[in-house]
Amino acid sequence: MMDQSIADAFPEVQVLEHEPLSKYTNTQTGGPADLLVFPESVTETKRLVLWAKETDTPLTIIGNASNLIVRDGGIRGLTLILTKMDDIQVNGNEVVAEAGAALIQTTEVAYQAGLTGLEFAAGIPGSIGGAVFMNAGAYDGEISEVVTSAEILTRDGEIKNLNNHELDFGYRHSSVQDYQDVVLSATFKLRSGDANKIRARMDELNRLRASKQPLEYPSCGSVFKRPTGYFTGKLIHEAGLQGFTVGGAQVSMKHAGFIINVGGATATDYMDVIHHVQATVLKQFGVTLETEVRIIGEEK
């Protein structure tokens, strides 16, 4: 039965109970969320965050669930998925996108406005919130290079506007991770450009992705961070791990840095593959592979 306090506090909000998160993650794995809500506005998100604090309910925030593994035991308390907060506005050379907006769609909006600077993100399957949270990047570009500010919501329900310096970006890191704040929106400072050149660069990067990455299978994208002085995929390839499989989770033959769902994988399968890859690379090369993918939830 639904937690009556959340039903009383939010009679107008659809609250899903014991909802399998495998329906929403890119890996198509993950256990249930006790309570799941898709907030549609900043106001609604703030009210839900404050409710969680006031009722001492564990709170988890999810974006597009593209670089995410949810363990098979699922997530206790309240989970918010922000994908319905997806407005994108263009103001001169600035693009302001809400946290749930897809990064791919944001790059398209920038292109249509004749703005250059976001081409590197073409094809990255995450949300704006997730991209800021982890300073997403590819092909020599990073979110930190184009974000001027982000509106965030603290776990105390306070809305702040953090500039680029305050976001303290690093390799796959931002201050949002340190304080577990909620990204509400981000502002990108771009430049006027030639629409044909912008489109050509986006198409080129999408072709590169398709040729190098196993896009035909469910996956969580790049699993490991790049260790200093090494290429992750090369290490995994040289360790002879491509094709290594546990259950339905497999180290991709196409790109060693990806773990794909070849059918019926569980999050436990994914974690077993990750741990085996880490142990093997450490033993063979003395290199520790840290996970880039966000791993949350409880063991089953």
Swiss-Prot record:
It holds the Pfam family MurB_C. Its EC number is 1.3.1.98. Residues 29-193 form the FAD-binding PCMH-type domain. Gene3D superfamilies: 3.30.465.10, UDP-N-acetylenolpyruvoylglucosamine reductase, C-terminal domain, Uridine Diphospho-n-acetylenolpyruvylglucosamine Reductase, domain 2. Its cofactor is FAD. Keywords: Cell cycle, Cell division, Cell shape, Cell wall biogenesis/degradation, Cytoplasm, FAD, Flavoprotein, NADP, Oxidoreductase, Peptidoglycan synthesis. The active site is at R172, S222, E292. It catalyses: UDP-N-acetyl-alpha-D-muramate + NADP(+) = UDP-N-acetyl-3-O-(1-carboxyvinyl)-alpha-D-glucosamine + NADPH + H(+). GO terms for biological process: cell division; cell wall organization; peptidoglycan biosynthetic process; regulation of cell shape. One of its GO terms (cellular component) is cytosol. Its main location: cytoplasm. GO terms for molecular function: FAD binding; UDP-N-acetylmuramate dehydrogenase activity. It comes from the Bacteria. It is found in: Cytoplasm. Pathway: Cell wall biogenesis; peptidoglycan biosynthesis. Cell wall formation. Belongs to the MurB family. This is UDP-N-acetylenolpyruvoylglucosamine reductase. It comes from Pediococcus pentosaceus (strain ATCC 25745 / CCUG 21536 / LMG 10740 / 183-1w).
